[in-house]
């Protein structure tokens, strides 16, 4: 009797335990260690143990999405069902076409199979900046000067046309100007999702050129305090950066906190001179907290970033003549002086505060989401004096409601979004007057997916009101955006077709600018007669892969009506050339992106990835090309992974090569640029079980080159422009606990 009781007791314990755990195995039914189990709707992750098992957190609602992923295996997305054993068998994946392939994955922006979404994992341990990391994707470039000021360019479009979201909040800063960065760093981020073109309905009412959605790393299901401390040194800028991160959870409470401090001097050119005033400093703190019950989840986030950015290649010359190269370069470097940001001019002081609250409610197959965000941006620009030439506050508040329902193979999203923006000047002189804009959008999206076939269709209506009391101006802008997609898979062939449209209202800077824009050395005039900019895009993606080779072909065509541009005039105001905003009736952007991945059978640890990006632009009004059209590029990455026991400390070696073709397809007011080659090398090691080391060399052959999108390529008196940094090395060290 005692034996029977004991057996029944252990059977009951095992039965209860089995309901709260799952297991991940390979094709041979062997448990897989270190598999990421991401509960998508709860923004919560955990990792499988050495036998492949994992414990399911308590109170996970039925029908919640779970993404199971591990490098070298095909990602799976399943729906959670309580009281059911979870056993996932992952298939080996020899060929992975970076983050551009059409695969099953859970995304904030939509279904990857039905919408043109690309994803990039963001690692705390990286030899490149946040922006440079993203530009490894085909068709993505950056515009800026050095590491301090960088901005994303997608298929030749940037600024107001490429909308940036951070944890659900649209970032409203000086995104209309190329002399300002994106306003935050890689601190605490987990990945970024990218939509190229105008098919972002849920978030992108004005995303004519694309949408970037940055997401924090998920919360961690673990009562043990975990985190990291990392440090980085890059001798191109003599950059010194330090970061930390902590994660902890208990009884359905979750906490993440991150901090960062980075300082950099003027960057070194290939001839060993230094570009004066390209130095910068960045400080950041980020905090997230969450509480979860069976049906509800609350998330609060706060983030603060403070930046001090020098503006290089800026000389106040009342004669408007050529600049002497010696005025913007220096021959030596003094760390004590160059780390001092208080003495340099011109200078930008940027302070950003971001507050976010999210609430999710789950019931049956439904998910209700409420989102509230508040963003405060303060910009001060100093010229040659102690008080700022500009001091402006930009405040943005955003509310969003979304209802998601799953019915068999259908997923329905219905929602609305309201945004209020206002800017206030605190100086007598200003570039943009005080003004407000308020807009509201309504959208509906229907997805259908069954086995190897799927489609989606959606529409969005936006209404925007812009007010500027200084000019006695009030105007309304409204339009409809739409998107539709079709997905089909046959054996190893996958094809997706997407057609979308979007619109963009004129920004305050385009309507009412009237002043010197110090970062660009020009006097800018707005145009209050500007109308809505409308874009339509056709995007086709074909994918084929075998065990050792994969290819993606992605042609696209985009037409933009009433394209807003800024052009020079034949006049001078306050010793600066005058530029005025204008509008072109029709602009066409077309091109092709090709991605290849080769994984030889005889050497399974070798990966060869290559992408080709081709973009052509045409202004039908002038029969010329658009300004700042990126040059065509070939990006090649060769990576060797090491798993041999005698090289246990060595993880991988990678070589990254960019070949940029010459760009002769220029607008009426810009100069062509030459072709160039840049080679970077990274070596990744694990010194101890919890210490990672990454050593890199950038611009290995010390190539002297000026990208066509460089912000400092058209400096008067400097033929060919100012080059990017020369050869440099960087060291990254990270301790994880």
Spans of features found by a protein language model:
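Outer-membrane beta-barrel proteins, especially TonB-dependent receptors
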Residues: 94, 101-125, 139, 144-157, ...
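Bacterial Sec-dependent N-terminal signal peptides
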Residues: 1-23, 737
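Periplasm-facing N-terminal accessory domains of Gram-negative outer-membrane beta-barrel systems
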Residues: 17-98
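Active-site-adjacent helical/loop segments in soluble small-molecule enzymes
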Residues: 134
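Short strand-turn-strand beta-turns centered on an Asx-Gly dipeptide
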Residues: 40-41, 166-168
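Gly/Thr-rich phosphate-binding loop signature of adenosyl cofactor/nucleotide-binding cores
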Residues: 697-699
